[in-house]
Amino acid sequence: MTDIKQILTDLIRFPSITPEDAGCQKYMIQFLEQLGFTCQQLNNGPVSNFFACYGKIGPLLVFAGHTDVVPVGEVSKWDTDPFSLEEKNGVLYGRGVADMKGSLACMLHMARRFIKTYPSFPGRLGFLITSGEEGDEFNLGTPYVMQKLEQQGIVIDYCIVGEPSSSLKAGDIIKIGRRGSLSAKIHLSGKQGHVAYPHLADNPIHRISPVLAELTSMQWDNGNAYFPPTSMQITYIHCGGHAGNIIPGELNLHLNFRYSTEQTDESLKTRVINAFTHHNLNPAIEWRLNGEPFLTNKGILLESCKQTVLEHIGTLPELSTSGGTSDGRFIAPYGVEVIELGLVNATIHQVNECTSLQDLNTLETMYFSICEKLLID
């Protein structure tokens, strides 16, 4: 029988740099179909997606994840071939071993073991997999699949996202939510002119400066028990001109908010627009909602996960909402209990990305135990 390491070896061989899947999902679908899963591919443009389900009735527990990985960077800086799994002293190296093909290998191995142990369990086990998580095509992935499932009347009860949530060892941190992300591209027009004749020009830098001073000093909220205060960062400023004696005629500015459940995207938009209005400016603003905040601070899934972690590593997990966004933000709005439980994130997106064989085995065992609690007990 193929063990977890061999499954991971197979997955790492696919150079699935986002949004390319490169054969990962074909491998996973074949694996799951051999176990009796019904699989449907839901590809969308350059992004590959599939949903798989075992069982006909009862609560539906879905394991969600992505097959795409970030680029490897300079291959010469790797100590190993990034697309060939290599073990050194119990540590496994390769692009995606932690984020998140290691979790996928645990999910597949667990599914086979669970179905062999409980072939007629009173529930349903599912997989929701995309190759569009790491890049700009994320809207073609999980949110698209969720729309299709809703159209088919498929309701997910519980979802475990296999993102690398842990800090020192598998299970020490569970993500119970994530902050929302809102971006703005702002264009402010002025009038180009010579610096010696400012009365004949209109400098957009000068005009926007008091607005930026107001926005960067603003206390958006105080956060709450689960989220830190909302933050805003200026991520890009560019003006025309490119000469020391020219007043630029336009300015482009990008902002990003990471916001708590104390805010909504509309409340943030209103405050930004009001700041510009207060200074008699009316720029063109293009908004992009990358994801709303979500929180699973209670429920059967969370309690099952907490108890499972305690049983397997001896301590209760830290419950956190820190870090960037994840695809959980597209699943939670459908009323699903969502948590993230995965491997250690210390080396994700880095050269020599790695995870330990011990953590893989621990994570697989925890996934199995959670399935028992939700689908058997």
UniProtKB/Swiss-Prot annotation:
Q: Name one GO biological process term.
A: diaminopimelate biosynthetic process
UniProt: Zn(2+) 1 binding residues: 66, 99, 163
- Pathway terms, separated by semicolons: Amino-acid biosynthesis; L-lysine biosynthesis via DAP pathway; LL-2,6-diaminopimelate from (S)-tetrahydrodipicolinate (succinylase route): step 3/3
Q: What is its EC number?
A: 3.5.1.18
InterPro entries annotated for this entry? Bact_exopeptidase_dim_dom (IPR036264), DapE_proteobac (IPR005941), Peptidase_M20 (IPR002933), Peptidase_M20_dimer (IPR011650), Peptidase_M20A (IPR050072)
Q: Which residues bind Zn(2+) 2?
A: 99, 134, 349
Q: Which organism is it from?
A: Legionella pneumophila (strain Corby)
Q: What is this protein called?
A: Succinyl-diaminopimelate desuccinylase
Quote the record's cofactor note. Answer: Binds 2 Zn(2+) or Co(2+) ions per subunit.
Q: What does this protein do?
A: Catalyzes the hydrolysis of N-succinyl-L,L-diaminopimelic acid (SDAP), forming succinate and LL-2,6-diaminopimelate (DAP), an intermediate involved in the bacterial biosynthesis of lysine and meso-diaminopimelic acid, an essential component of bacterial cell walls.
Q: Which cofactor does it need?
A: Zn(2+); Co(2+)
Record: active site? 68, 133 (proton acceptor)
The reaction(s) this protein catalyses: N-succinyl-(2S,6S)-2,6-diaminopimelate + H2O = (2S,6S)-2,6-diaminopimelate + succinate
Tell me the domain of life: Bacteria
